[in-house]
Amino acid sequence: MHPILYEILTFCLGLLTDKVVSTNQNQLSGEYKMAITTFAKTFGQASTKTESNNGSRPKAQFWINVGYVANEGTEDERFISLPTGIPLDTQEHLPTNSSNEDFRAMRCAQNDLLDQLMEFAKTLEPGQEGVISLQVQLRRVKEEAPAISASENKYARKLTF
């Protein structure tokens, strides 16, 4: 039986067996009190957990904005960026303990890029901007490939028990 349906049925059963609903919860049947307590635990705490998680997240101070300079070299020069920047100082280093040397080297280079960007960002005064030369890669995700059937898979084999 679905847990929510169980809670509703338990709640209704508590109402029926108590005959007279009292405002004093100490006089209610155990099933009825338990249903109220369980319902509050199940549905009351989820929103508080979400709020506390959002509040505990560090707020980024350094951002990478992708865009271009409009009216370059004029008095009306402006940096036009995408609507959402990339928070820099809330990113963590990637693990570099792979046994594949090439993959490990790539991860080390990614961590080094993050370190270099953070080093430059820390030299900026609050509100100051700096232009850096990086390449932007635009990528479209491939469509999901169909599963390979066991009869066509060169690695699959039928086990005998």
From Swiss-Prot:
Identification of the protein by name: Uncharacterized protein Gp2
